[in-house]
């Protein structure tokens, strides 16, 4: 049997990564490249050059000399460049460096303990079979063994572990299947990473006791080595072993050549190969004798890729070579030079011993006479220097071939292998993940309301180009013959015929006879020897009813691609789209373009017709809200058509019904007229009813619906009605929509019913009759409303609609006049100034607030101003709207538009008729310039609200220039935001999608990742599909009950009941209820033994047992235990029964898809509540319902079961899209500007990035909130607790600082600058209420800490001057040098974390983000510099000082390092105060009792301050009240002068006198809890959970909450953190009024915490993924490729990314199963 070209007969099962060995590459290569010129002078490939024809043709003109094929058939052949000197393999350079660092160069062994090696080896072996728990078991075995035998030998350890390992490996059931799971991969990479990090830095070799050789790497191209000063030789070293460190090298520093590194590595492999082979498992060569060859770390020759993959591009006559070729050419040039140099050195016998002499014949000939001119181009003195230099140059050129970033010094870079793979333009993302497609069209879209909502208008141009391959059969041959005869240019025609053997016949556009001939032979089989299988295939044009996929970019969520049926429009040039679909695509018609794709197989078409069709996409997966809906004109038309008093004559009625039902097949049902005399009239409501009863499918009962319209009942009321007892204004009003059996009886239809809003008419039709019917309803209503506007109504808007009555206008003017005087009052209120304060005083204070560092007061002024002007704008709006308008609704067309939801909002009408109101930028009033003006036309600090952006003008009468300017500022802000936002949210969405792409609901209803690991046992914790749950709310139950007949019929209730038995689930629910009725208080649950012991306790006590306490148990307890054990079975069972736990929820016991009525507990309670309510209602009502109570319950349970999520649903992608898509609507910089009484919170995309992408341990605005217990005692004490937790800075208690500067000359040389600093503190009364502090404490702080800080900062300022250098220098000792290495290492780790925070910026985000990441980088560099300078200058002083210094130096990292002063709170932690809580109860002791106040004591205090630093000359302080102190500082005269006062002020603002670790501020806010009771909540900025635990009697710790997810996870465990993640994401969206279904959030949170720790969705989080291809297609492809190669990873091709890369069908959706055909 012939296999046709496109018949798959083999399938990819997996991909493994590994490295070719040198021998294999030699065999693969067809040519050794030796000629550095790749093209000769004529532009043809030169022999032995990089474009040699043996490597395959470089363009279409040439023929391959290896396989003699042309360009299109030869796939190319590898060549190689032989390197005269060995170089390091750039891929493995970092690992080689670690290996050299962690091994002894003397005895060639690893320096880590033997136990570590054997443990890791066994752990890696058990992980290969997926035995995770064995990893920890092995650690336990080893620890136990080491405790028993303190000094075991390596073989003993091995035996101990080996036994357990072999047992595990042999008893394994899964085979290697278990190894490709996320947890195993994570564990493996963790163990290996830990090994490299922790065990590669021993101080000396444990085997031969030699010290460590220090290896350094420079520029990724050379290794330098410092040998140890002492080497221990073992006596019996055999001659055969490679020598260790030679005598001459001891203590020297030198350059480690690749050759000597290779020798060491080979020796190391002999000793440690058994272990290292496992560590680098990816490099085992199965075909070779030895397992793994260390020569992989080195390159002896370089592979040259085939020419076709680096083509020469031609532009006119010029030729540009490919970047890869340039890189290889640089290597070639070096090779030629090195060969010459080596030949010369061999001639002069100056070769170093590690370089072999050249042996080839050519080189021997060349030894005779060598031109020495080339030496001048090489750097270096002697020949050996020159050799080493060019060797390093060769190394860096080889590096560039792999990765052009590796050479930081080269300016013009050509892409290396890494650059070809990575980023958006790389191979993975551009050519494997996304590919260009055929059979697609793109054009501008324009609106059309006459096609169906599920159609798309296709212009003729596209219709004749897009074709579909249709097999010819006897029943369609007629049609296809006609198509072939019509040819490629006439629609419906065909462009090509594919014959049975796969050959193609193109149909000629001009030759009619050729087409006819082909048409006649469509069914006659082709003549040929073997009988071919199959038939001819005709590529026919698109015709009406074909399905196309439409897509508009950006494709942010599932509805951005939907399937539409084609409708061919002959005269058009553009795609025509129905208005209703705009919202799904987020399209408008201002020039948007869309893409259409034409599926090419019956399978693809079937999926498009049934699943992707527009009718099925009515609800959005984000939160189940409808997307499709009619717009603008249709709203106005529909509302006015269904208003009371709208009548039609017979011909108008028929015309409208016909217009609405143009494509109905069959009879049209009509309604009888509602008015008969004087002549028959039909109402507008009847027209709509006629449509409805004709659209609803024949065999279904029409629907019943009670709902509300968008236009409120109040809007129709012209004047207030007389009060009538029991009158309900909404009953039978136009705002109440009632539909009975498909007839609209009451109410106006507007946006709430056919717009994109939930629970309207269209949504209800979708729920009961399915998507097809709801689509028809939308289509027909659109046609009907359009016709009504065209024929009978028309709609316009004039000036009359916006005019205001004169009376209202006068009122408006008066309020505006009043508003101009509110300024001074607002500033006074904000700054707590007295009423009497003069304007100048107020203005001065305002200026201070504006120019001061702490912007809180200024924000407060802003806030007060906003409150004041809001009041006035509301007043104006009340005066003008709605009764102040000249015309009122419904005559007023503008109001009609706004009320019916067509366009515009009340804000727009107010801006037209009332005033524009307060202009805000980023949430605050327009900022002031430095001069205090907001715009040049105002005075500085002007009080009128107008100057702060309050626009009193309106568009009706025009606005003034400054107001216009403010208005434009607000407009500009919106544009800036949109531009910046896109890249941020786009990258965020990409991160989530790449992580969650594999999560799919399986056939057992679990959600699993692509490697099979269970993320959730039921999707979203109840297994329901979001769009189907919309009517499972108690509010919608009445609708379901009133339409029960339709639902039972459409959902096949009787069939379900005949198959599924609800008894098991119902029985289970009964058991749970029974248990709950017996245990009303679920908190007090006791075990069986406890209940028993309580009962017999008294009896045992009476026995008065006398015996000693054994094992810490009293005799009474032992007696009780004995009695319990001796109790007979029956009595014991009685106790156990009482103590039985509550049965598990039904969902976890009975699978909901198999067992009917197994529903979630919440739903069960909702159904219970509703059925009681319903039963009560039916008793009251006059007519008895046919629906029985049981039937109602069964109906709701059926609806629930039918709402389960289908297997195959890609819930991971839906969750990612549902978080990513709304985040594009969030404005980027929404700050929550804190006034004085509020917390600062990170919002919007920055907060989302913090939670999802970074999962950072130190978040920007950490906070805790705890409700205060509602007891008198607690409410009293919480005030002092708040005071105690608030941190105090020196700046807050300083009144002023006086600085006097003078000059002093003692002798000729000694000139001094003398500063006298006098600090005046605020009186105690000022801060007594707020701060936990006394004047003495401040003074003590100044003396012990502040002056030290001051001297430190002066020293920093003057570091360049030598005088300060001499004060404290300290020699660097050997110990420091040793520590430097350690320090570098720990800093490396820190940098890792830092990087995690700052540098997760992929290409996309960087586009709009250069400034931000630069700033971050700069900040990081500065920080590092800080750390280093700190190391040099640190004094041996108290640790606290460093703490304080660090805090000083890095005020922006305060959150990270608060002064650790819990134990010794300055000023409070004196010896007398035992602990903090005591403060709340004990009265303060007066000061003088603590400190002796004599002259000696004073002298001692002054002396202590003087001793702080030589430059402190004198000190005085206030002995009476402790309200001031004065210090004199005498500095040697410097070259540099600096401003002492600014230095002192800035220090004072940052110096912390008193703080609770981690907490900066405390606030008490009043809120209402769930039960609507008021309660106090304590909010803190900063986090310190253990501190709050001390105050259990004040705070309700059970309800403590914090937004720091790591803190919660560490304190309360991962499940608590999971809930915090959900709540935090929900809160971020809630600020913008965006609802995201909690099921999405729970899935994301579950995924992030899957491994038991909270992991980010970034490249650090994807490290544990079991699919290397998924990692590589995400970010840093090269990194992951190296990793996969080293570990020899295997990709099972299960993840969607991996499937896309190799072209498999993704295992999700319809790809989750396979249809197999019985062949019998």
Curated annotation (Swiss-Prot):
Q: Where in this protein does the record say Phosphoserine is found? A: 240, 1386
UniProt keywords, alphabetically: Chromosome, Disease variant, DNA-directed RNA polymerase, Leukodystrophy, Magnesium, Metal-binding, Nucleotidyltransferase, Nucleus, Phosphoprotein, Transcription, Transferase, Zinc
Query: What's the catalysed reaction?
Result: RNA(n) + a ribonucleoside 5'-triphosphate = RNA(n+1) + diphosphate
Residue segments, region Mediates the interaction with TOP2A? 1060-1155
Which residues are recorded as binding DNA template strand? 424, 429, 436, 1249
Give the span(s) annotated as Funnel.
Answer: 805-883
Family indicated by similarity: Belongs to the RNA polymerase beta' chain family.
Name this polypeptide is given = DNA-directed RNA polymerase I subunit RPA1
The gene name reads: POLR1A
């Amino acid at each position: 049997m012939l296999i046709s070209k496109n018949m798959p007969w083999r399938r990819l099962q997996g991909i493994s990564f590994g490295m070719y060995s040198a021998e294999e590459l030699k065999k693969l290569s067809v040519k050794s490249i030796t000629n550095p010129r790749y093209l000769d002078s004529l532009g043809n490939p030169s022999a032995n050059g990089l474009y040699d024809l043996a490597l395959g043709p470089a363009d279409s003109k040439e023929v391959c000399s290896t396989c003699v094929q042309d360009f299109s058939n030869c796939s190319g052949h590898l060549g190689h460049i032989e390197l005269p000197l060995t170089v390091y393999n750039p891929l493995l350079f970092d690992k080689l460096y670690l290996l050299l660092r962690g091994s002894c160069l003397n005895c060639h062994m690893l320096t880590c303990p033997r136990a570590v090696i054997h443990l890791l080896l066994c752990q890696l072996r058990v992980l290969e079979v997926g035995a995770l728990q064995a990893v920890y078991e092995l650690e336990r075995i080893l620890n136990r063994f080491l405790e028993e035998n303190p000094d075991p030998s390596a073989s003993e350890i091995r035996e101990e572990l080996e036994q357990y390992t072999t047992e595990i490996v042999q008893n394994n059931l899964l085979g290697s299947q278990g190894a490709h799971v996320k947890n195993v991969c994570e564990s493996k990479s963790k163990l290996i990473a830990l090994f490299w990090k922790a065990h590669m830095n021993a101080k000396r070799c444990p085997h031969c006791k030699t010290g460590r050789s220090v290896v350094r790497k420079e520029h990724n191209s050379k290794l330098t080595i410092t040998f140890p000063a002492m080497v221990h030789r073992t006596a019996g070293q055999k001659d055969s072993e490679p020598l260790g460190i030679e005598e001459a090298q001891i203590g020297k520093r030198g350059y480690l050549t690749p050759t000597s590194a290779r020798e060491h590595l080979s020796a190391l492999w002999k000793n440690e190969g058994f272990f290292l082979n496992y560590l680098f498992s990816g490099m085992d060569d199965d075909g070779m004798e030895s397992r793994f060859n260390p020569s992989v770390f080195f390159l002896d020759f370089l592979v040259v890729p085939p020419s076709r993959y680096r083509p020469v591009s031609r532009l006119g006559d010029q030729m540009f070579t490919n970047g890869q070729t340039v890189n290889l050419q640089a290597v070639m040039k070096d090779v030629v030079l090195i060969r010459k140099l080596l030949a010369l050195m061999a001639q002069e016998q100056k070769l170093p011993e590690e370089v072999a002499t050249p042996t080839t014949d050519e080189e021997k000939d060349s030894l005779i006479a060598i031109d020495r001119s080339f030496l001048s181009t090489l750097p270096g003195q002697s020949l050996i220097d020159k050799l080493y230099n060019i060797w390093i140059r060769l190394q860096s050129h080889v590096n560039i071939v792999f990765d052009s970033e590796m050479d930081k010094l080269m300016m013009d870079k050509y892409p290396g292998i890494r650059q070809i793979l990575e980023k958006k333009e790389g191979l993975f993302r551009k050519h494997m993940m996304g590919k260009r497609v055929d059979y697609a069209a793109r054009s501008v879209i324009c609106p059309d309301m006459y096609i169906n909502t599920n159609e798309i208008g296709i212009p003729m141009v596209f219709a004749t180009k897009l074709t579909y391959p249709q097999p010819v059969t006897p029943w369609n041959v007629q049609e296809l013959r006609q198509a072939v005869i019509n040819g490629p240019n006439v629609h419906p025609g065909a462009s090509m015929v594919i014959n049975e053997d796969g050959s193609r016949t193109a149909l000629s556009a001009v030759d009619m006879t050729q087409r006819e001939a082909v048409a006649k032979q469509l069914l006659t089989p082709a003549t040929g020897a073997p009988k071919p299988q199959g038939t001819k295939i005709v590529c026919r044009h698109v015709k009406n009813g074909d399905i196309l996929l439409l897509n508009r970019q950006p494709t942010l969520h599932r509805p951005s691609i939907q399937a539409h049926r084609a409708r061919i429009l002959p005269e058009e040039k553009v795609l025509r789209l129905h208005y209703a679909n705009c919202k799904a695509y987020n399209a408008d018609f201002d020039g948007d373009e869309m893409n259409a794709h034409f599926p090419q197989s019956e399978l693809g078409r079937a999926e498009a017709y049934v699943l992707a069709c527009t009718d099925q996409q009515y609800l959005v997966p984000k939160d189940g809200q409808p997307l499709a809906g009619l717009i603008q004109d249709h709203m106005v038309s529909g509302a006015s058509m269904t208003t009371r008093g709208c009548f039609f004559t017979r011909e108008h009625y028929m015309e409208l019904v016909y217009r609405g039902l143009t494509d109905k097949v069959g009879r049209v049902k009509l309604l009888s007229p509602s008015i008969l005399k004087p002549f028959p009239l039909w109402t507008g409501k009847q027209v709509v009813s006629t449509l409805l009863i004709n659209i609803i499918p024949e065999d279904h009962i029409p629907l019943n619906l009670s709902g509300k319209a968008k236009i409120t009942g109040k809007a129709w009321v012209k004047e207030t009605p007389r009060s009538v007892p029991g009158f309900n204004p909404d009953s039978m009003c136009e705002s109440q929509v009632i539909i009975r059996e498909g007839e609209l009886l009451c109410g106006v239809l507007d946006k709430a019913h056919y717009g994109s809003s939930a629970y309207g008419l269209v949504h209800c039709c979708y729920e009961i009759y399915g998507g097809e019917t709801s689509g028809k309803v939308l289509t027909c209503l659109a046609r009907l409303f359009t016709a009504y506007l065209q024929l009978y109504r028309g709609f316009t808007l004039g000036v009359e609609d916006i005019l205001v009555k004169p009376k209202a206008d006068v009122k408006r003017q008066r309020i505006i006049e009043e508003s101009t005087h509110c300024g001074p009052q607002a500033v006074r209120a904000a700054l707590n100034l007295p009423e009497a304060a003069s304007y100048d005083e107020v203005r001065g204070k305002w200026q201070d607030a504006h120019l001061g560092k702490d912007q809180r007061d200024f924000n407060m002024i802003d806030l007060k101003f906003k409150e004041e002007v809001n009041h006035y704008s509301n007043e104006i709006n009340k005066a003008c709207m709605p009764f102040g308008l000249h015309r009122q609704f419904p005559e007023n067309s503008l109001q009609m538009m706004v009320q019916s939801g067509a366009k515009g909002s009340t804000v727009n009408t107010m801006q037209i008729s009332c005033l524009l109101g307060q202009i805000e930028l980023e949430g605050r009033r327009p900022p002031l310039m430095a001069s205090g003006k907001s715009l040049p036309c105002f005075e500085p600090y002007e009080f009128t609200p107008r100057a702060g952006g309050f626009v009193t003008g309106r568009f009706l009468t025009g606005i003034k220039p400054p107001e216009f300017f403010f208005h434009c500022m607000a407009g500009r802000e919106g544009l800036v935001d949109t531009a910046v936002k896109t890249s941020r949210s786009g990258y965020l969405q990409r991160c989530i999608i790449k992580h969650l792409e594999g999560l799919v609901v399986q056939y057992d209803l679990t959600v699993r990742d692509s490697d099979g690991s269970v993320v959730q046992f039921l999707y979203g914790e109840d297994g329901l599909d979001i769009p189907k749950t919309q009517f499972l709310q108690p509010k919608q139950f009445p609708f379901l009950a009133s339409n029960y007949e339709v639902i039972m019929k459409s959902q096949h209730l009787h069939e379900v009941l005949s198959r599924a038995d609800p008894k098991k689930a119902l029985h289970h629910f009964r058991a749970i209820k029974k248990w709950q009725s017996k245990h009303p208080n679920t908190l007090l649950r006791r075990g069986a033994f406890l209940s028993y012991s309580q009962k017999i306790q008294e009896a045992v006590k009476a026995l008065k047992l006398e015996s000693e306490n054994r094992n810490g148990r009293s005799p009474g307890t032992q007696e009780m235990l004995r009695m319990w054990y001796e109790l007979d079975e029956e009595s014991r069972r009685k106790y156990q029964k009482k103590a039985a736990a509550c049965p598990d929820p039904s969902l976890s016991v009975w699978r909901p898809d198999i067992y009917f009525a197994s529903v979630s507990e919440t739903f069960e309670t909702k159904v219970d509540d509703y059925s009681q309510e319903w039963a009560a209602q039916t008793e009251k009502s006059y007519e008895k319902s046919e629906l029985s109570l049981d039937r109602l319950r069964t109906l709701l349970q059926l609806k629930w079961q039918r709402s389960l999520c289908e297997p195959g649903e890609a819930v991971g992608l839906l969750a990612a899209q549902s978080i990513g898509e709304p985040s594009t609507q969030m404005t980027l910089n929404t700050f929550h500007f804190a006034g004085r009484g509020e917390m600062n919170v990170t919002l919007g995309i920055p907060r989302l990035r913090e939670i999802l992408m970074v999962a950072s341990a130190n978040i920007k605005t950490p906070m805790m909130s705890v409700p205060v217990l509602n007891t008198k005692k607690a409410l009293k004490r919480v005030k002092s607790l708040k005071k105690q937790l608030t941190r105090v800075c020196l700046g807050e208690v300083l009144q002023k600082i006086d600085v006097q500067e003078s000059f002093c000359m003692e002798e000729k040389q000694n000139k001094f600058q003398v500063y006298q600093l006098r600090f005046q503190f605020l009186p105690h009364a000022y801060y007594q209420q707020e701060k936990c502090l006394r004047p003495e404490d401040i003074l003590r702080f100044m003396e012990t800490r502040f002056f030290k800080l001051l001297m430190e900062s002066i020293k920093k300022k003057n570091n360049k001057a030598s005088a300060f250098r001499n004060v404290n220098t300290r020699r660097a000792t050997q110990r420091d040098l040793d520590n430097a290495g350690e320090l570098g290492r720990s800093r490396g780790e820190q940098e890792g974390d830092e990087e995690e925070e700052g540098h997760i910026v992929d290409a996309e985000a960087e586009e709009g983000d250069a400034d931000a990441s630069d700033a971050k980088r700069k900040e990081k560099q500065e920080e590092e510099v800080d750390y280093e300078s700190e190391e040099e200058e640190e004094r041996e002083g108290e640790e606290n000082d460093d703490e304080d210094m660090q805090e000083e130096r890095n005020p922006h990292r305060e959150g990270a390092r608060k002064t650790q002063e819990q134990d010794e709170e300055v000023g409070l932690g004196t010896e007398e105060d035992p602990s903090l809580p005591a403060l709340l109860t004990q009265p303060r002791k007066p000061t003088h009792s603590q400190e002796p106040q004599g002259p000696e004591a004073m002298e001692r205090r002054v002396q202590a301050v003087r001793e702080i630093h030589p430059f402190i000359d004198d000190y005085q302080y206030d002995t009476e009240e402790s309200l001031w102190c004065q210090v004199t500082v005498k500095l040697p005269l410097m070259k540099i002068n600096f401003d002492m006062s600014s230095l002192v002020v800035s220090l004072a603002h940052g110096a912390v006198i008193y703080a609770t670790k981690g907490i900066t501020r405390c606030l008490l806010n009043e809120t209402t809890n769930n039960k609507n009771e008021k309660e106090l909540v304590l909010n803190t900025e900063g986090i310190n959970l253990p501190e709050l635990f001390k105050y259990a009697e004040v705070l309700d710790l059970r309800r403590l909450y914090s937004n720091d997810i790591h803190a919660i996870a560490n304190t309360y465990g991962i499940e608590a953190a999971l809930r915090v993640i959900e709540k935090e994401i929900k809160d971020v969206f809630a600020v913008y009024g965006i609802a995201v279904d909690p099921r999405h959030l729970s899935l994301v949170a579950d995924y992030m915490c899957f491994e038991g720790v909270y992991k980010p969705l970034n490249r650090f989080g994807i490290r544990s993924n079991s699919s290397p291809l998924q990692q590589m297609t995400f970010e840093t492809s090269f990194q992951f490729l190296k990793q996969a190669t080293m570990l020899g990873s295997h990709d099972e091709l299960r993840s969607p990314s991996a499937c896309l890369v190799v072209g498999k069908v993704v295992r999700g959706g319809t790809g989750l199963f396979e249809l197999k055909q019985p062949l019998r």
